[in-house]
């Protein structure tokens, strides 16, 4: 009887532990997803020239996040219009001078970009130097990046082919988001198994059946993180999954790094690169694996930046354009927050924050909010003004002295539609170049 009781207690303890871990993972997923405030949407998918022109990404629906995308024609059907539409999305246009990925001040407009598989060299050449600069600015400014197969190759310094260092290619056109070589696996039209190390950050989000294995992941000419003969693994690279594969004379990838992450510094986004193709699967562990990579990438978004300190009685003019290269005073973009700090003195009877637009550009909706001790958002404070228009006044009666934060939010946004090339915008497209405003605080 005692033995039966002991076994029952042991089983109950194991079940409790499993439930606790499942809850912990669910909380980790929810925490990452809760930090989307101040971004236009979570995901932008690149299916541009040379890449798979995918119109759906199952993991976005699985996670419940919003996505927009660009999808070109197939390589054999490409035309000048594909280049025009791709440049409009990534490089900019009259109504959006720095492209969809970036706000007017250079902050990331999406939390993450996902780059599909396909032909990395063709895509890199099609986007050119300007497109590469936009992608680099996006990641450096805090936007995260996930690339599979070609999307992993193109994010590296160069690709390393079978001939060793003599086969080093594309160093002049790749995006250099990760300072290492993506080495060809030489494996085509096959399946691989991925093994997650015990310390893999992806295990924060799912347990993958408890064995840390993801089976039957499609692989077609993908890559691994080169570590050794020609260049050591870049400092800061985190192995997230390894290949499990019965090596042959031609293909020797067992135990090699199949998925890896990299974050250059505290202000940059996180880059996650995967040599295989889990992205099209709509169920099971491969879907969870793709979702985990997305979550880990988005977890690398840095904390929002403070634009500056508002001083008593001074009017701060936020009217610069992208071309002025002065982000601390640049206009606000659609669904973006601008954060400011104020120092309320002792014995202050009230603090009045005022917001207004500029003549000829007041037909936008800006809102205002404030909070003591932490950044203000619509959902964490009752001190807010959300009426139509730009002009606002927010009075804080008998405020406690100390550090407060004031935030401006641009309610006006574009109307997003889907067509032949993926997303296109209608409606208030002028908001993409930013809304100018003036903000001040006065103490009594």
Q: Where are the model-predicted features located?
A:
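Noncatalytic accessory or regulatory domains flanking protease catalytic cores in secreted, cell-surface
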Residues: 366-433
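Extracellular ligand-binding/catalytic regions of CAZymes and related secreted enzymes
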Residues: 28-40, 47, 54, 136, ...
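Helical hinge/lid and interdomain linker segments adjacent to catalytic or ligand-binding clefts
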Residues: 52-164
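Hydrophobic helical h-region of N-terminal Sec-dependent signal peptides
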Residues: 6-16
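Class I SAM-dependent methyltransferase SAM-binding "motif I" and its flanking Rossmann-like core
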Residues: 140, 155-209
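Acidic, Ser/Thr/Pro-rich low-complexity intrinsically disordered segments
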Residues: 329-379, 399-403, 443
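Surface-exposed intrinsically disordered loops and tails
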Residues: 74-105, 161-169, 210-231, 307-328, ...
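Catalytic beta-strand/loop cores that center a nucleophilic Ser/Cys/Thr
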Residues: 192-267, 279-282
């Amino acid at each position: 009887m005692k033995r039966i009781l002991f076994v029952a207690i042991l089983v109950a303890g194991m079940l409790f532990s499993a439930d606790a871990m499942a809850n912990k993972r669910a909380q980790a997923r929810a925490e990452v997803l809760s930090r989307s405030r101040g971004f236009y949407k979570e995901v932008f998918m690149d299916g541009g020239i040379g890449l798979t022109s995918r119109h759906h990404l199952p993991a976005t629906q699985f996670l419940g996040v919003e996505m927009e995308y660009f999808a070109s024609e197939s390589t054999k059907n490409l035309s000048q219009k594909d280049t025009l539409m791709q440049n409009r999305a990534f490089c900019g246009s009259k109504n959006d001078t720095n492209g969809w990925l970036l706000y007017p001040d250079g902050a990331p407009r999406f939390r993450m970009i996902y780059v599909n598989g396909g032909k990395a060299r063709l895509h890199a050449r099609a986007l050119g130097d300007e497109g590469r600069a936009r992608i680099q600015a996006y990641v450096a400014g805090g936007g995260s990046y996930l690339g599979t197969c070609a999307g992993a190759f193109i994010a590296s310094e160069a690709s390393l082919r079978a001939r060793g260092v003599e086969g080093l290619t594309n160093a002049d056109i790749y995006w250099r988001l990760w300072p290492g070589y993506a080495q060809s696996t030489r494996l085509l039209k096959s399946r691989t198994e991925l093994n997650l190390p015990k310390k893999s950050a992806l295990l924060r989000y799912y347990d993958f059946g408890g064995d840390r294995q993801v089976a039957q992941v499609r692989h077609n000419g993908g890559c691994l993180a080169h570590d050794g003969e020609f260049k050591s693994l870049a400092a800061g690279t985190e192995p997230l999954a390894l290949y499990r594969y019965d090596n042959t004379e031609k293909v020797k990838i067992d135990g090699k790094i199949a998925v890896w992450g990299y974050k250059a510094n505290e202000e940059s986004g996180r880059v996650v690169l995967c040599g295989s193709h889990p992205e099209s699967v709509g169920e099971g562990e491969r879907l969870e694996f793709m979702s985990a990579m997305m979550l880990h990438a988005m977890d690398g978004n840095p904390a929002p930046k403070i634009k500056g300190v508002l001083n008593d009685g001074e009017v701060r003019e936020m009217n610069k354009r992208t071309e002025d290269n002065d982000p601390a005073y640049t206009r606000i973009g659609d669904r973006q927050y601008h954060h400011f700090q104020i120092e309320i003195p002792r014995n202050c009877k009230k603090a009045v924050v005022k917001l207004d637009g500029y003549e000829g550009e007041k037909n936008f909706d800006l809102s205002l909010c404030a909070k003591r001790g932490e950044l203000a958002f619509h959902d964490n404070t009752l001190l807010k003004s959300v009426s139509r228009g730009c002009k606002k006044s927010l009075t804080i009666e008998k405020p406690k002295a100390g550090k407060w934060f004031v935030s401006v939010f641009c309610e006006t946004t574009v109307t997003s539609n889907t067509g032949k090339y993926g997303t296109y915008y209608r409606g208030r497209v002028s908001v993409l170049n930013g809304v100018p405003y003036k903000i001040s605080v006065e103490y009594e």
